[in-house]
Amino acid sequence: MAKELIFGHQNPDTDAIGTAIAYSYLQNKLGYDTEAVALGEANDETKYALNKFGFTAPRVIKTASNEVDAVMLVDHNEPQQSVSDIDKVKVTHVVDHHRIMNFNTADPLYYRAAPVGCTSTIMWQMYNEKEIEIPQDIAGIMLSAIISDTLLLKSPTTTDQDKEAVVSLANIAGVDYKEYGLKMLKAGTNIADKSEEDLIDLDAKSFELNGSNVRVAQINVVDLPEALERKDAFLKAMDEASKREGYDMFMLLITNILDSDSEALVVGSDESKAKFEKAFNAKLSDSEVKLPGVVSRKKQVVPPLTNAFEA
């Protein structure tokens, strides 16, 4: 059987990397020849989780077709979020928890998606269905992914399935998920030593919304006022990125993981800003607005933006 690469989206988070690792282990147990890789360097939170459970970060690839003919995707399906030459390889498997958009294939494939808080929750279910024992380290990295995506089960994306998976995986991994989870999340909130250009690209995704190219980035912090001291520099970096990459709108969501509130910074045309204000029923003031309780890009940001841009 020919080798396949497994990877998550660009600017990978803990779910993108952790689920790729877990899926590769599962598929290899089932007879496939796979390798988990990444479409970018691991962030500080992910590095903390990898180190905790004894993993080295997957190698980073820029293209896939120079290595393999087929790939498996986790935690994404939209082509603009995937490897740059996704159109040159065959996608044989997808495991995801996001909307399906601009995705089509020439051949049938395995596609597993569910509206849960994290792709690793689906992966946990797949291990159980296949009756494959989950090793301690794999359980730990899957647990880390769910904690990351659900903000320690506080995100509105959290489901009973996520909660059940966390309890089960924490037991296998041998950790107190609340204590470990808070340490892991805090490890990802150190922004002092990073440039604005790096921060707006660490956890960012592009979306095609009715012909508009919309970029949504998110950073997690424990001190929101301190982060907002860099507002002008953030806006400058966002504006430069928009001009360089052709974004019609760039939104940066700065989320306080301790109280689950966010502040949004927005750059773009007057038309796109008007659509943003319509989406959130909120008025921008000097390119900034408070978004209380908004922590999930997938559930609380992309759907209202989609509706506003398609209206």
Curated annotation (Swiss-Prot):
Its EC number is 3.6.1.1. It catalyses: diphosphate + H2O = 2 phosphate + H(+). Mn(2+) 1 binds at residues 9, 13, 75. Mn(2+) 2 binds at residues 15, 75, 97, 149. It is an enzyme of class 3 (hydrolase). It comes from the Bacteria. This is Probable manganese-dependent inorganic pyrophosphatase. It comes from Lactobacillus johnsonii (strain CNCM I-12250 / La1 / NCC 533). The lineage of its organism: Bacteria, Bacillati, Bacillota, Bacilli, Lactobacillales. The gene is ppaC.
